[in-house]
Amino acid sequence: MNPYQNNDEIVDVPENYDNNLNRYPYANDPNVAMQNTNYKDWMNGYEEINPSSITAILASIGILNRVIALTGVLGNTQEVISIIQDALGFIRNGTGNELLIHVEQLIQQTLATQYRSAATGAIYGISRSYDNYLMFFRQWERNRTRENGQQVESAFTTINTLCINALAPQASLSRRGFETLLLPNYAMAANFHLLLLRDAVLYRNQWLSNSISTANVNLNILRAAINEYITHCTRWYQDGLNRFDRSSRANMNEWRRFNAYRRDMTLSVLDFATVFPTYDPVLFPAATNVELTRVVYTDPIVMAGGRTAIPGFTRMENLVNSASRVSFLNQMNIYTSFYFRPHNIPRYYWSGNQNFLSNGTSNLYGYRSDGRTTFNVSNIDIFRVNMTTHIGGAFTDDYRGLHRAEFIGANTQNNQRTSLLYSVEIPSSHFRFENHTVFLPGESGLEPNERNYTHRLFQMMNEVSVNPNARGRVFLHAWTHRSLRRTNGLRSDQILQIPAVKTISNGGDRAVVLNYGENIMKLDNLTTGLSYKLTAVDSEASNTRFIVRVRYASMNNNKLNLVLNGAQIASLNVEHTVQRGGSLTDLQYGNFKYATFAGNFKMGSQSILGIFKEIPNIDFVLDKIELIPSNFMSSLEQTQNYNTYNQDTIYTHNQGYDTYDQNSSGMYHQSYNNYDQNMDTTYQPSYDNYNQNASGTYDDGYNPNASDSYDQSYTNNYSQNTNSMYDQGYYNNNYDQHSGCTCNQGYDNNYLK
């Protein structure tokens, strides 16, 4: 491509290059299963990391994606069991040791020999015992005899004891002084333990054939465990971050190691912790749409050195995107320039790129030039980038850069493999070429494809170093998880969980706060609010009534108003969650509470939902908004239990959990209970006047017809049979329920009491 002959090369509908992948000049065939070579490409020269440790990351990624799929079938017992068994298949005898070795290399610490065998064997032992438990559970499901129930209880007791012995404070997976080192193993074991405890809440009273329900005890053990495990994961993740030198003295190698720790611990620890709360079957009684908002970065491709400076820690960290509202890559402009020498031959290179995002913003990296190639990618999830770089020049020149890049992705409209190619001419006689492949592993193997990819390209950044007759560059790729969707699709058979940072609202009084990988929204001013576009995926969803629940943290009591298409439909008094002397800058799991608006509401086929904070000068953080089909839960007073129970650890818990003080009668403004909003496509003009400070409220790039058509694989392709999941024992007067609700909970028809 000559950039001066075609200044605006637009690629609107990319050609399918599925049969031409080998056109790219690989040193090795890219269609052959990638092992050590591609891992080194993925880590891009980070030699301190043992290539074999990729198997540990693959295990974590594989299990995580099964976990996200699992949240999409909560309520369907057989689907849940099948997914758990699939996840267990990722754990081999050496998985625990591989995870341990990997973190040892990242944080430069070694576990004492006498503790290693206990730690590395714990995960394998738990997985094998869990598999045995599932066998007995399925047998009991098919034939619910007392004898089969006793076998389930025996298997349950065995694995529960294994988990507690491994996860308890100072046990094999939380050894004092080595907590960070053991964290991926800890998170994996915690995940399986919580799934086990979830089964106890739903079924233990039945397989034991108890006449007196123990559901409350089992529920509170589960909730205490969720709190314990999330707190442990976030605390020791932060401890690991604090070990790195992040000063201006730190160099590129230190940043590489820091970034590898942040990325790999996100994939193997923090992502699990984000999903753990959905294992509470009272708060999440059915399929739930879970989306991860965090951004991770593959290792940089460094084309600097020689006569150009290699960026240090600070310059590299400046490339990393600060916390922001959710957005997606819609378009990328790539700019082409030419080197001063050698003369009379093509010598073009990638001089810069500009990323255009779905929220209307754009970011420029490097330099603009007249030569421009434009890729429209709003309907493409790029999951892999193949790059050819060069080093060389004439005489004493030291030019280092990029002249070829192939972006491979999935067309989200038809799920077909798609390739976009940037290529400019540069002579091999004067330059040495190197090939690089950048990606994050797929769901069931190292190499991602259009079916199993787990991450999509969010942004591509580059840092430039310039000297006379010398150029150096560093390329960095940012990725978001596939579970994050462009739209908020309402379904009649699923709880819609919307991360607060998916808001279409903007402004300085709406700050995004990074909270252990995931992003949350901080609201400051008097009428500050957040708005969200909702789209019903079908006519049934447009006629479904939804309960609205929020997860929040606040320094003081406040009042929230719920607004639908410009009309206020409910209000809610919320309690402070942070104790005196605390702050919203380092929020822990226990600092968040759930609160539910009274009533249920029909959203229509398309709508804009707003949450507005009423009381001024009170810092307030919103984490998630959840829309729950009203048929799943006729009452949500259990949410108040969740907020106020005694959160002792599961190892010293008080068996008197059965009594709660649920004096929640003063929590709700009881107006608007029967609001019916059936507005398909029209929004009331008065909506714009509700928040006087709102400007640029709507995202012009919104596509009302998108409706999540591109990625239903995580949550939507399962039978949602929720009729036989719940034990009425949750609600059999074991709580002090002063909420005034005496309604039939609707879960009491199919279980032994």
Curated annotation (Swiss-Prot):
GO terms for biological process: sporulation resulting in formation of a cellular spore; symbiont-mediated killing of host cell. This is Pesticidal crystal protein Cry20Aa. Promotes colloidosmotic lysis by binding to the midgut epithelial cells of mosquitos. Active against Aedes aegypti and Culex quinquefasciatus larvae. Has low mosquitocidal activity probably due to rapid proteolysis to inactive 56 kDa and 43 kDa proteins. GO terms for molecular function: signaling receptor binding; toxin activity. PANTHER family: ENDOTOXIN_N DOMAIN-CONTAINING PROTEIN-RELATED (PTHR37003), PESTICIDAL CRYSTAL PROTEIN N-TERMINAL DOMAIN-CONTAINING PROTEIN (PTHR37003:SF2). Keywords: Sporulation, Toxin, Virulence. It comes from Bacillus thuringiensis subsp. fukuokaensis. Toxic segment of the protein is located in the N-terminus. Residues 712-721 have a biased composition (Low complexity). Belongs to the delta endotoxin family. It holds the Pfam family Endotoxin_C. Residues 680-696 have a biased composition (Polar residues). It comes from the Bacteria. Residues 680-721 are annotated as: Disordered. CDD domains: delta_endotoxin_C (cd04085).
